[in-house]
A protein has these predicted regions:
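Substrate-binding and catalytic surfaces of secreted/luminal carbohydrate-active proteins
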Residues: 1-155
Length: 155
């Protein structure tokens, strides 16, 4: 199963809320529901939300390319996807993970190529949350600020 063709747009203008929503709903939520991948649509649009070929007239691209200067702006969708795509490699498998802490949502993966593990956590609570990451007989503490997203990778 692939989660495809979701897009942000001018209707969702609060950057931090958008980042949290994308990570919670798409990166963590879809993959916890066994989606093999998440695709946002459109990848690149200009500052006028174009080119426009029908459908959503004010969708936002993962990146915005200025039609005059060519400058590229990485949008919140880019950073949400980056939390996974930089660390979760092709052929990685989702592995069991739990948080047990109100407001923290997470998903974990094992990379097939090197056996490394990746844990993505988003804090949807209105306050910081202390947490302890445990893997086997090893652990470390971490405090995740309200609305924050973090990615851990270890061997």
């Amino acid at each position: 199963m692939y989660f495809t063709e979701c897009s942000g747009g001018a209707w969702a203008s609060k950057w931090s809320d958008n980042l949290t929503w994308y990570v919670r709903t798409l990166v963590v939520g879809a993959t916890r529901g066994w989606a093999r991948g998440v695709l946002l649509w459109n990848l690149a649009l200009d500052e006028q939300h174009g080119p426009h070929l029908g459908g959503c007239s004010d969708c936002r691209g993962v990146v915005t390319i200025n039609s005059v200067t060519g400058d590229v702006t990485r949008n919140e969708e880019y950073y949400a996807l980056a939390h996974a795509s930089r660390f979760v490699r092709p052929r990685a498998r989702r592995i069991a993970s739990t948080s047990g802490i109100e407001g923290l949502e997470s998903v974990a993966f094992r990379n097939a190529d090197d056996g490394s593990k990746v844990l993505l956590v988003v804090n949807v609570a209105g306050a910081q949350r202390p947490m302890v990451v445990r893997a086997g007989d090893r652990s470390f503490p971490f405090v995740l600020p309200a609305g924050a997203v973090v990615t851990f990778r270890w061997n």
